[in-house]
Design a protein with these regions (language model features):
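Active-site flanking residues adjacent to catalytic metal/cofactor-binding acidic residues
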Residues: 4, 89, 178-179
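Conserved PLP phosphate-binding loop immediately N-terminal to the Schiff-base lysine helix
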Residues: 144-158, 174-196
């Protein structure tokens, strides 16, 4: 049997599986060291490449998975703003951390979800209502650049969507987190925020 994975490993396999050039480079680096305790020279080189390539990036930090990255982003947003609530898209996925889970899931306690607010994708009226009601408590708004639920069709942002979101977040001291784990470099090598016309100047905060 032959199988065609149209989901591309949930996003990152944009060059396909068993790509000989990529596999060779990965094996070469593996032989030089795997899971080292401190940054290796190649990690520094990659960080410099990323910050040069992504206009709004002042620095790069590596994590072992997307959930670690989004969790750290949430922590930074809370520390920066002094606020606690998280605003996200219904059915959006940003990892397996407690704040991302359905409150009825086994092992999830009330405190995991009581600081989380959810709105529908592409609904600016609903977004504005949340900001009006909870803006002083919301630390961040986290979303993928376009909606790509697991078992439904993807949906692009409507015209002006992200510019409106960015403006409202800036006005209300809300950190805007664009989760590019599944979409990064697929839309634009500078990051999907570039294609969405977000962050028109370096270092938006």
């Amino acid at each position: 049997n032959k199988y065609l994975d149209l989901i591309c490993g949930w996003g990152p396999m944009i060059l396909g599986y068993n790509n000989s050039k990529i596999d060779k480079a990965a094996r070469t680096q593996y032989d030089l060291g795997n899971t080292v305790s401190v940054a290796s020279p190649v990690m520094v080189e990659l960080a410099e490449t990323l910050t040069d390539m992504v206009d709004m990036a002042d620095w790069a930090l590596f994590g072992k998975n997307g959930g670690d990255s989004t969790q750290l982003a949430i922590m930074v947003a809370r520390a920066e703003t002094g606020k606690s609530k998280i605003l996200k898209i219904k059915d959006g996925y940003h990892g397996a951390n407690g704040w991302m889970q359905n409150k009825n899931n086994p092992g999830i306690i009330n405190s995991d979800s009581e600081e989380v607010l959810s709105i529908s994708w592409n609904d600016l009226d609903e977004f504005d209502e949340m900001i009006s009601s909870f803006g002083s408590e919301i630390a961040c708004f986290i979303s993928s650049p376009y909606d790509h639920p697991t078992s439904k069709d993807s949906s692009l942002p409507k015209e002006g969507y992200w510019k409106h979101i960015e403006k409202k977040c800036s006005e209300n001291n809300i950190v805007l987190i664009v989760d590019d784990v599944r979409t990064g470099f697929r839309i634009d090598l500078k990051g999907s925020h570039n294609a969405c016309l977000l962050y028109t100047s370096p270092s938006p905060r």
